[in-house]
Amino acid sequence: MSTGHSKAAKEFLKNQTYAKWHDATFWSVRTKRDNMAYGLEEWEQLREKASAIKRHTITHLDEYLDQFATNAEKNGCIVHWAKDAKEFNHIVYTILKEHNVKKMVKSKSMLTEECEMNPFLESKGIEVVETDLGERIIQLKGQKPSHIVMPAIHLNHDDVGELFEEKGISTEKGNHDPTYLTYRARLSLRNEFLTADAGMTGGNFGIASTGDIVVCTNEGNADMSTSCPKLHIAAIGLEKVIPNYDCLAVFQRMLCRAGTGQPTTTYTSHFRKARPTAEPMHIILVDNGRSEWIGNPEHWEALKCIRCGSCMNTCPVYRRSGGYSYSYFIPGPIGINLGMLRDVQKHSGNVSACTLCLSCQTVCPVKVNLGDQIYQWRQQLDDFGTANPQKKLMCKGMSMVYGSQGIYNLGTALAHWANLIPSPLMNCGLNPWAEGHKMMEFPKKPFHKLIKDLEK
């Protein structure tokens, strides 16, 4: 009954020392989140408010998108609409080509990961430099993010130190001190900022009432990406638009507390228009399936997500299997749901990567019903033609047993004879349960028989 996720998780767990470190690291972030939440008496009210704002905005998205675009254009920005990833990449390339851009620096953006923008631009001869430290590390390593907020969390300081030595960023061989490595990365990135022809940012929020793009970072790289080059391109998904600054105040109090256990991000950057001496600012609003997802009655609330990553930090499966065990580029509970919205045939294997503990729903700052949605996806696998045939057979057998009182009574009466089966026969490859579990010992008397005996 293996899935792509379970097979990848098995590889992840081969290094038990690393697996335990990974689990403990993310649980510590979850603990920091809890401490921050407990420090605000109004935390649950904020969650309710944030959820209500998102529900309202998404169900009136056409109005707010029109308002945002109108105000952005009044500010002097050039607004583009991209229906899918292909059109988005084409728009970005066209803008860069018109300005003879050879190198572009960019701050963190999961949207560009979604649209696979970097490899597209590189195939056109344009160098793209990630400026978020974690993103830069995995870019140099040729990897994808393993977490949406902490993309290089799966690497330790020795991994990074060796990488920096290989790339010529670090000059002191064997010096893997994090402070030193950060210093060397800063020097390297400073040169990239100063020699770039264009800068790109994503956006945590788009403010409809003003046309502003708001970017939250801890490193200030979004500011550097827009202050040094003369051309600024901002790209956001349609769902990132919110009504006004009063709404932003709610999300600003929650985003970082939920994601990393900090009171707020170090930098909150507001972009309304280009600098006086710069080229006009370009804003790209990307659909790429979102308008279709809004029409899904059971799963549209996944669009409320503000990409804080708290569902991953708390998820017992993500913590013990890693981000690369998932087939979708966003891992964890939110990634399971978004992946299924994207392509049920490709990502159905992820829905088993959930214990239905609902911890993700407990911590989500905008109250996305992540676990409930995963449960709903599981009920639909047979309709999609992606249900596991072994599980289907097992469920039919269980239905037969529990649907017949006689068969059930016979099974419970004879169950203890299974204790006599030699262990090598039970704990073999033909019994998936034996991997990671010990077979239970069946009592001689089933529970209902014990109760009847007590009642005599």
Please describe what each predicted stretch is.
Residues R275-A302, Y318-N427, E435:
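Ferredoxin-type iron-sulfur electron-transfer modules in oxidoreductases and energy-metabolism complexes
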Residues M1, H5-T25, G39, M394-K456:
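Intrinsic disorder at enzyme termini
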Residues D84, C311, N369-L370:
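Helix N-cap / loop-to-helix initiation motif
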Residues C305:
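Phosphate-binding glycine-rich loops and their immediate beta-loop-alpha structural context
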Residues C308-M312, C357:
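Extended amphipathic alpha-helical segments enriched in small hydrophobics
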Residues M1-E298:
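The feature marks the mature, well-folded catalytic cores of soluble enzymes
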